[in-house]
Amino acid sequence: MRVFRTADFPGFGDDSPQGFVQQLEALKDLLQTGVDPARCAQPMMGDPALPFRPWINMKQTFCAQPQIIEFHNGRGVRYVSYYSQGPNPVLEQEVFYTFQALTEDGEFYVSAFFPVETGIFPTEPPACPTCGEPDYDPFAEWTAVLGEQLIQLNAQPADEFEPSLNVLDELIKSVQIRN
């Protein structure tokens, strides 16, 4: 878990196409309007990604099971995600739970992430018997496979993740940020 002072964000510079200030504004908007589940129903290779700090040099490939959660003195969005630099197969060990939040006074941005096992994704890259064939479209295949996996992921009960999303949510609800 990381806690950032939001007053420091302008001094961090624009380290990514969506810098600290932009991520802060995106999170504020999301917490006001809520999360449209359809936003997390399809693979994405770029914006509009859900807010995520700290910045990593990859794109959010998907979000799943988004939910607004309140903690002792703030609220945020939790979701399951995966980041990649391209349309690579999602591997089980690279999927994680994240929570992105603000304290009630807006002074602190809270970011937490934990690995989770879903039981949906492979642990090794799958074989590709059609790779190299003239009509093979790797992006179309990636989109179709990941789309099916996201249907399963978004429908999966929270207790079927390891650790359970409910357990991680309870951990998040217990967080208290003090000056």
Label the predicted regions.
Residues 35-107, 113-125:
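Signature of long, low-cysteine stretches enriched in small and polar/charged residues
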